[in-house]
Amino acid sequence: MKSMLSSLRSFSLACFVVVSGFAYANEVAVGAGDGTKLNITTNTTWSASNTYILQAQVFVKSGVTLTIEPGTVIKANNTDGADLAPAIIVEQGGFIIADGTKDKPITFTANQTDAVLKADPRGHWGGLIINGYAPLAGGGTSFVEGVTGVPYGGTNASDSSGVLRYVRIWHGGRSIGQDNEINGLTLAGVGNKTVVDYVEVAYNKDDGFEMFGGTVNLRHCTALWVGDDGFDTDEGYTGKGQFLLTIQGTQVSGRAYEMDSKFES
């Protein structure tokens, strides 16, 4: 127990260290910022030598891998140009390899000043959505709210959508569709060959983590001061969680865990 708490404490404290290098990396715009969605259709690597300014909803298509190097920083604008939040959506059959390290975590955050984030830390961009082929309680497929034409669910419990390790997701939860605020990390029908380890969601407007069905396992994950639940499961999620930590605020928060087994009627 002491070892686990020490591990979580070290990771969480490291996540809130101000990294001065954020300001000095080359800035690379991702998306046009005019409301046009960006499809990634070839294998792509985001380098730690750049800071990526996310200004569109970005879709990683089937058969394509988005690799993000350790230490990379992605800053998302408040809008995609059409009053919806920028976000990264990994489609079924797509892969994200965001394999950071303890000393070089990968950071998704808001492209805002410290003053703005201090005044209102939640809901400044969308979040990360991963769609897989793992089973749902009701069978078949479904769709994440606000994401049209991108299904999740299937029959492959051992499906892999890639790796998220030593990843930080901050200040998200803005709407990606009409009245559809999203979670910091949405795992929709994601299979148990996907690695989710040492992932932190902080100051998200909606849930920290939400699993819609699927079998993905979570280890060393933290949800800090989110506006709704720390961890939320729906549609017959059957994965496992180990070393999960939630810290909730006193003014805006939901539950540490909310778990539903079937589709909502």
PLM segments and residue spans:
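Short intrinsically disordered, low-complexity coil segments enriched in acidic
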Residues: 1-2, 19
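Bacterial N-terminal signal peptides that target proteins for export
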Residues: 2-12
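Bacterial N-terminal signal peptides
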Residues: 10-21
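Beta-strand/loop edge motif enriched in small/polar residues
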Residues: 24-265
